[in-house]
Amino acid sequence: CAAQPGFRGIKLEIANNAAHPCMRHVAKAARAFNLVVLQHSWSTTNIKDRKHQSDPADTALFARRHPDVRIIMAHLTGIGFRGVLEAKALPNLHVDTSGGYPEEGLIEYAVEHLGPDRVLYGSDLPIRENSVTIGRILGADLPAAVKQKLLYGNTARLLNLKLN
């Protein structure tokens, strides 16, 4: 189905660990079909959880192993400051703003450390209300042009969408 018109990415949920060697097959498919990989990520403290959960370090390792694959580390409010720092040196690794409840200053921190082109809106629907997920960006202390990039420009660029 990846060859179908309009197919833009691969979403990997909580059932896998991004550091697992089998992820090379996902990277190969993403490369072959020019797809973005969105990896569910969450900071974990219990090592047993990491079998089926990707900690920010796991997602960063996946990005480091496959520098030619565009990867989104999902759930900024689940990966927190540590996730941003894990992504900082990896230009192919982006973060989305979905996840838990808004945390004051976190979006600004991500933009400061990753730049305005590597942070993008994430809704995590139906778990979060759109008013909350959009509001965390609209309420951030950022210039309007940066907010536009976060809300749609960066995603459009990553997914090769044409904006009219």
Tell what function each PLM region has.
Residues C1-T45:
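Active-site gating/metal-coordination segments in enzymes
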Residues R8-L12, V37-Q39, I71-A74, L93-T97, ...:
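Hydrophobic faces of well-ordered beta-strands that scaffold small-molecule active sites
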Residues D49-P56, F81-L90, E104-H113, E129-G139:
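Histidine/acidic-residue-rich catalytic or RNA/ligand-binding cores of hydrolases
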Residues T77, S98-Y109, Q148-K162:
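C-terminal helical cap
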Residues C1-G6, H25-F33, L61-H66, L85-L90, ...:
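Acidic (Asp/Glu)-rich catalytic clusters
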Residues H75, L114-S131:
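Short acidic/histidine-rich active-site segments
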Residues P116-R118, S131-N164:
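Mid-to-C-terminal alpha-helical segments outside catalytic/metal-binding sites
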Residues C1, A30, H75, V95, ...:
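Conserved, mostly hydrophobic/aromatic
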